[in-house]
Amino acid sequence: MKHSFYHKKAGTILIKIFILCFCVFSKSYAQEITGQQLLKKAIQYHDPKGNWDQFKGTLAISMQSADGKERLSDVSIDLAKQFFKLSTAKNGKTVAYTILNDKIVLQLDGKTDFTEEEIKTYNLTEARARFMQNYYTYLYGLPMKLNDPGAIIYPEVERKVFLGQEYLVLRVKYEEGTGKDSWFFYFDPKTYALKIYQFYHDEAKKDGEYIVLTDEENFSGIKIPKTRAWYLNQGGNYLATDTLTKVSKLEAK
């Protein structure tokens, strides 16, 4: 009996040592790469020639919402000239926001004078134009945009299983005045391609959304995610899908 007891005790100790070693190994494996190193590798995958800063093109985007409605948008971006234009269909009309440097032009079916009701219905404000400029250049410029001033790249990289797949996860926050949300970017551990990103307005409340990326469009040497499916963090409810149907060269302005 005594001999058996010692065997069991030794076996228990070995199991504990194995578990401890496994946990230490798992943690160190994720930390073979730092946050900045992961970001560098991801940018090398998506923009190997460093062309994003000179991006000049038009994105044709189809947005399909959960209720089946479709919205078509054309987004033209010339980063070098600080040019941005969004043209989108809304309620049977075409809304356009054009920004060149600090000059903003708002249009509704080509006209630039609006009633108060039109301004409210179609969100025809300069603030909205700036928001949409930041929205599209950020989302379609990832992961390169994570090099922008104000981004705080956490040094720790987490290895995490999400939706049945394993990823390297980079955490990013922003300096005050730049952004308030907490962001998490999920990269393929082999290719370093960006596969998912997730944001929280308040992590404690588990609010916000996650966006699943599939397929790619290659334009000017940049690998741009083609399809983005949006879901709520809480409950995983499906919201919408943005599909990049075409990328074309932007004609000279």
Mark where each language-model region is.
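Intrinsically disordered terminal and processing segments
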Residues: 34, 41, 45-49, 92-94, ...
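Gly/Pro-enriched, hydrophobic low-complexity segments
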Residues: 161-253
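Flexible, processing/modification-adjacent segments and terminal tails
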Residues: 31-37, 106-180, 204-207
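Bacterial Sec-dependent N-terminal signal peptides
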Residues: 1-35
